[in-house]
Amino acid sequence: MDNSVYQVYEDEIQLLEEEIKLLSDKYEDIQQESTFFSDEEVLMSVKLFQREFLEEHKGHGPPLDLKAELESLQRDLSFLVKFTGIQITSHSKKTLEKTGNRTVQKHRLSGNCQSLPFSLEFQLLEVQNKENVSAAITDLSIAIESGQHSELSKFVSRAEENGNLLMFFRNLSSYAEWCEHRRCTFLHFKAKYPNIVTLPEGQEGDHIILRNPQLPGFELMIVWKMHIDEEGTTTPVLDLLPKVPQQALEQKKASIDNAPACFRSMLLLFGIETAIENLIQVVGLEK
């Protein structure tokens, strides 16, 4: 084989190496920006990128390592959505300033955390130094459709003041997870005891009412609130509010007065679900 043939192969190899480097750089850009886009947008971009690449390079399979990394990115994104419950549905950004090593961009995000919708906007200041890039978030504004989630107002105000998006999303995820757990628990008892359990505010409400069809005027209200402390940690707070006819109140006043304290003791001993179940059984409300 003469030298001209070798030269052809060497030229072809060099071209392929340059294409691989170009694709790798493009992939790194996608990876860096992926956190600002919804999962649908990322998946659409990945598919479009794959289609364009295949059309441009028919007869040549894509580099296996790049294809594997793209598939890994898809799996990681899906895992994060399932793990955190946070799904970004829309994102937009606008460059407000770009001078020398300083860049200011305005971002708008909206999405859902479990069943809790949210939207926010902020400015991202990036300063390029010789060795690294420093970033800071300013003018953070958060809007959450609180509705029955009034306890979120102080949490949102603190997050806006601190400008810590990571802490905001982490604590919001924990809060939304507890709300989802409450919703599922209430629905479970409503399905198990349909003639006894009532959800006055629907499945997203913060309390249920237990009524005995055989005891008109007697009911127990289980209130399940969420407490968010200064650090953003969510703690469930449950209480029992009995309502009884006047005659029964006079006859068993001590027992009725002690009912909330007994319920709180059961919560500590057995946990939320078992405490509610035991309450139903103890007061003779089970069918």
Curated annotation (Swiss-Prot):
Under the heading InterPro entries, the entry gives:
CENP-P (IPR027801)
Q: Which domain of life is it from?
A: Eukaryota
Q: Please give the function described in this protein's UniProt entry.
A: Component of the CENPA-HI complex, a centromeric complex involved in assembly of kinetochore proteins, mitotic progression and chromosome segregation.
Describe its assembly. Answer: Component of the CENPA-HI complex, at least composed of CENPH, CENPI, CENPK, CENPL, CENPM, CENPO and CENPP.
- How far does the signal peptide extend, from start to end residue? none
**Which of UniProt's keywords are assigned here?**
Centromere, Chromosome, Coiled coil, Nucleus
Q: What name does this protein carry?
A: Centromere protein P
Which residues, by range, are in coiled-coil regions? 1-37
Q: Name one GO biological process term.
A: CENP-A containing chromatin assembly
Main location class: nucleus
Q: According to its UniProt record, where is this protein located? A: Nucleus; Chromosome, Centromere
Q: Which GO terms describe its cellular component?
A: chromosome, centromeric region; nucleus
* Family to which the UniProt record says this protein belongs: Belongs to the CENP-P/CTF19 family.
